[in-house]
């Protein structure tokens, strides 16, 4: 067990899978000689060679297309079974605009056959990546760039897999529930700390994966607190939070003491300007205000 950043946990998990299974390879822009834009694959080409750590041209279509063909032929690229894992660095905090700071997980969550993975902790980043690489289906692994070096925690040294569809209680509480994933887990945590001073106990449920998602854990939290806020960085319309809210309304309506509340990004492209990006991404004060509104019911 050692303390590692979110980025280090991803790197270690990827390296372990490549060491144990020679069919696993990495392909992407600057992943080889340069070690990746964020240095996740630093040193990989020296250890595994240029045939397993492949620098691709600046064409996402070519990368995914190559992965698809390799998977069909029996390899396990990191894209009947098509075992592809597509690593998708995403999320705001770096002023990357609509090209690099978006959270498009909901765009893929409605496509049958794809698995959508959104780790929030270093331990889950490693374990969920191992599960994704060994899964027989295409997996979209959303790693939030803002967490790379910001979050650090104990991570087991040995190889392990974290199961899909099993939510994690990030913080137990009795009065309000926040359902979230990815970097928003920590936004919710900061907001909950402020409400704790008011004597309001907030439960934070980290979904970990959106496809499959842990409906049972969500409903249990709803029945425990009866007041629910769904929080995500994706836009409001069509965001996965709408699916969660609809399921709660269908299956736990009588357990609610207040309408399900959603806090999301607005329905606009992600701005480049840092102040505008901050206004776009849900902030701690937004969550605090939403939770206080719910607590008044």
Tell me what each language-model feature is.
Residues 1-137, 278, ...:
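Thiamine diphosphate
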Residues 23-24, 138, 201, 227:
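The start of beta-strands in P-loop NTPase/AAA+ ATPase cores
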Residues 53-55, 116, 140, 204, ...:
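Conserved beta-strand scaffold positions in the cores of enzyme catalytic domains, especially
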């Amino acid at each position: 067990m050692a303390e590692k950043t979110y980025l280090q946990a991803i790197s270690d998990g990827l390296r372990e899978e490549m060491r144990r299974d020679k069919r696993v390879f990495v392909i992407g822009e600057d992943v080889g000689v340069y070690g990746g834009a964020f240095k996740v694959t630093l040193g990989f080409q020296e250890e595994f060679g240029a045939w397993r750590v492949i620098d691709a041209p600046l064409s996402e279509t070519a990368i995914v297309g190559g992965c698809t063909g390799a998977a069909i032929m029996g390899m396990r690229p990191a894209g009947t079974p098509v075992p592809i894992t597509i690593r998708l660095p995403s999320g705001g905090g770096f002023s990357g605009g609509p090209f690099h700071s978006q959270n498009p997980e909901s765009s893929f969550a409605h496509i049958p056959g794809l698995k959508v993975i959104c780790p929030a902790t270093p331990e889950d980043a490693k374990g969920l990546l191992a599960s994704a690489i060994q899964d027989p289906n295409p997996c979209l692994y959303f790693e939030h760039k803002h967490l790379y070096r910001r979050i650090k925690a104990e991570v087991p040294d040995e190889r392990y897999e974290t199961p899909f569809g099993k939510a994690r209680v990030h913080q137990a509480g009795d009065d309000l529930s926040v359902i979230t994933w990815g970097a928003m887990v920590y936004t919710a945590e900061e907001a909950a700390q402020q409400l704790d001073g008011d004597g309001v106990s907030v439960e934070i449920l980290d979904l970990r994966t959106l496809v499959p998602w842990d409906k049972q854990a969500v409903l249990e939290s709803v029945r425990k607190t009866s007041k629910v806020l769904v929080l995500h960085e994706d836009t409001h319309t069509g965001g996965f939070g709408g699916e969660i809210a609809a399921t709660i309304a269908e299956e736990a309506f009588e357990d609610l003491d207040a309408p399900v509340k959603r806090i999301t990004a607005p329905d606009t492209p992600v701005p480049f300007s840092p102040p505008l990006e901050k206004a776009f991404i849900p902030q701690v004060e937004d969550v605090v205000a939403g939770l206080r509104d719910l607590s008044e019911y």
